[in-house]
Amino acid sequence: GCIMGKCSFCTEPLKAKVEWRNQKDIHNEIKAFYDLGERNFRLGKQACFFSYKGINATEIEKLLNPISKLKLNCLHIDNVIPSLVDEDKTKLVVKYCTEGNVAAFGVESFDVDVVKQNKLNTSPDTAIKAIKIINKIGGKRGPNGMHYFLPGINLVYGLKGESKKTGDINFEYLKKILDEKLLLRRINIRQVTPLPGTAMWDVGTKFLKKNKSNYWKWRNKIRKEIDFEMLKMLVPKGTIMKNVWMEVHDGKHSFGRQMGSYPLIVGVNDKLELKKHYDVEIVDHMLRSVVGKVLTA
């Protein structure tokens, strides 16, 4: 469930009342997997990690502290509602979790008309404030080469009240974030799916159809002019990314990722042995991936 429970397109309000698992149950489950050899975990599938047990920093620390003592390779969280971001809870995530962690923000739109008509859970100004807080506290680079904790943004197109100006407004806010040198780990761009029981079900695909011709133009502009420049700030040339797990070959090239919630795709111009970790130095950038050279095998 979700403590907000009002966004027009979301199915969370259709579920039962908001419930939280007890820390002990979560600890026992993680320990059981740990004893079987697992060292990588994500505390996911919740609408907002920061809302745990009534937006309670003490309860969040009781959850994270014992898990961190297991010295895991990876401990990441999931979604965060921007309006619930503060320094205290952010510091707990940075203290107890591992680097490469991402707070997925359901901003959905920076167009205030769309925000109001769809009862979205955050305003543009609130989202920017949350981005600044997480950058301030989580923006230091960790041992594996990635930052400890950064925001990610979800954008949804086709919502009620969307107009031709919506794409421009979204771009302007993203450009402002980029110009202020605030880091976003990733930007998810999707089209809404009206589902039964949601407010968007009654609206249907009216706005999707209305702006269909604009969607790919908006999306591609963000990918080329925001994502690409953001990636160069996120992992500049010379950055060392450690423990990249090589997964697939494409011709004479190898592609891998670090363990994590939203790991970067790293391409290497060599046919490397797969299912093996490598330390990689970043030498170039693609639109949404990076090119590296292996330092150690």
Please give the residue ranges for each predicted region.
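C-terminal, active-site-flanking charged/polar segments
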Residues: 32-36, 174-184, 192, 272-287
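Terminal RNA-binding accessory module
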Residues: 209-297
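Canonical Radical SAM [4Fe-4S] cluster-binding loop centered on the CxxxCxxC motif
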Residues: 1-25
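Conserved, mostly hydrophobic/aromatic
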Residues: 2, 26, 105, 153, ...
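Short acidic/His/Gly/Ser-rich catalytic and metal-binding motifs that mark active-site loops
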Residues: 5-9, 113, 196-200
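Conserved SAM/AdoMet-binding glycine-rich loop
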Residues: 31-165, 173-176
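Radical SAM enzyme [4Fe-4S]-AdoMet core and its adjacent flexible, acidic
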Residues: 53-58, 64, 175-242
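Active-site proximal loops enriched in glycine and acidic residues that flank catalytic Cys/His/Asp
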Residues: 11-14, 30, 45-47, 79-81, ...
